[in-house]
């Protein structure tokens, strides 16, 4: 948890020195609140929000604690997910897939390890688009070609993206 307060030139930035989790309360030395409560406290209930989340493993509990109604109201979620074998991971992925399409998956090459198999890394950036606004293109290649935005997180470390075999012609 990094409580540094970045500046936002020309914008309004309100920083809350708290963590997101599945319930409200203190744990160890930190205060946690739910995603829904944080949205409400910011005055954003009912507004179209794009959620950007990188909370070092707490995403699993916070998303399990989020109601289906809250998730249905969010058009897009961009987040780094952490872990590969925790019991909550499959439950969260299934929950997200009820409402969202996973449209981008990029493995953080700072976390590449064979120990995360079958995944190539234990940290991965994802982008989820709500099914009520996303439209699947049946003619698009699966997986989609890698975007230049998915450059390696570390330019000096080997990359470890999933590779799919291409049919030979």
Can you describe what each PLM-predicted range is?
Residues 1-169:
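Phosphate/nucleotide-binding beta-alpha loop and adjacent structural elements of enzyme active sites
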